[in-house]
Amino acid sequence: MTQLLVTTTENIPGHPYEVIGEVFGLTTQSKNLVRNIGAGLKGLVGGEIKDYTKMLEESRDVAVNRLRDNASAMGADAVVMMRFDTGSISQDMQSVAAYGTAVRFITEDLTTDNA
C-alpha cells in the first residue's frame, strides 16, 4: 500500500500540481449468514447494526488503499477531490468506491541557463 496524500480539497497549499487523470479504488463486500441473522434481529428492535458498520468501515479502508495504489501506478504524488460512493449490488452485497483526481506536483527547475 502506498501512503501518498489523499485529500477531499481541490488545492494543496504550497504544492502546485498538474492533473494526471481520474483514479478509482473499488471493493465489494458480502454479508455473511451470522451478520444477516444479527441484522434481522436488530432490525426488529432498532438501533445501529455494528457488524454492518464495521464491514463498511473496512470496505472504505480497502477502497482508499486501492485508490492510493492505483494513483501511485499512474505516477501521482497525491489525489485531490477524493469522494466516496456506496451502493447495494444485491441484498447481500455492498460496494464502496473511492474516487478522485490523481495529480503530480510541479517542481521548479532551479538551474540557470547561461547560454
Swiss-Prot record:
It comes from the Bacteria. InterPro entries: UPF0145_dom_sf, UPF0145_YbjQ-like. Belongs to the UPF0145 family. This is UPF0145 protein lp_2083. It comes from Lactiplantibacillus plantarum (strain ATCC BAA-793 / NCIMB 8826 / WCFS1).
